[in-house]
Regions:
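A structural-propensity feature for long, helix-poor, extended segments
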Residues: 108-129
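Beta-hairpin (beta-strand-turn-beta-strand) motif
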Residues: 80-83, 102-104, 118
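Short, structured patches in soluble enzyme cores that scaffold and shape functional sites
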Residues: 5-7, 101-103, 126-128
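Structural signature of FAD isoalloxazine-binding scaffolds in flavoprotein oxidoreductases
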Residues: 92-109, 124
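N-terminal non-catalytic cap/leader segment that marks the start of a structured domain
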Residues: 1-96
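Structural motif
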Residues: 12, 21-22, 103-105, 112, ...
């Protein structure tokens, strides 16, 4: 089950991602869960999964994605977690590097990613687990 936060017709919501659009869980479960973070914290995945086979409420063409969790408390990251990546940078420590990210450094699906002027390229290693 793929989940996302999004805007549709100027209304913020969250839902289940399907190829043809979104099942709007905000509309269906919003009285109990105000956003995707609340759904996850409130163990609402079982409730959400009841709608998996439903038709979409929102066409994909009208969706503007938001960062998955808009106001995370913490973003803890693991860097250099692949052996091949460590070799690329001549790192011999077998333990991965831990670092933090800030909420305002997130971007949404299909949103532009801005490269800092002092960087020559983007780093291609990026993963997110919630």
């Amino acid at each position: 089950m793929k989940l996302a936060s999004f805007i549709y017709q100027d209304i913020r919501s969250f839902g289940i991602v399907k190829a043809e659009g979104m099942i709007d869980l905000g509309r269906r479960l919003g009285d109990r869960y105000g956003d995707l973070k609340a759904l996850l914290q409130g163990n609402g995945l079982a409730e959400a999964s009841r709608y998996l086979d439903d038709a979409v409420d929102v066409p994909m063409g009208g969706v503007t994605f938001l960062p998955v969790i808009e106001q995370p408390e913490k973003i803890l990251c693991v860097g250099m977690n692949y052996a091949e990546k460590r070799k690329e940078f001549d790192q011999h420590n077998p333990a991965p590097t831990l670092f933090v990210r800030f909420a305002d450094s997130q971007t949404a699906h299909n949103a532009p990613v801005l490269k800092p002027r002092h960087s020559r390229e983007f780093d291609y290693e990026g993963e997110l687990a919630v």
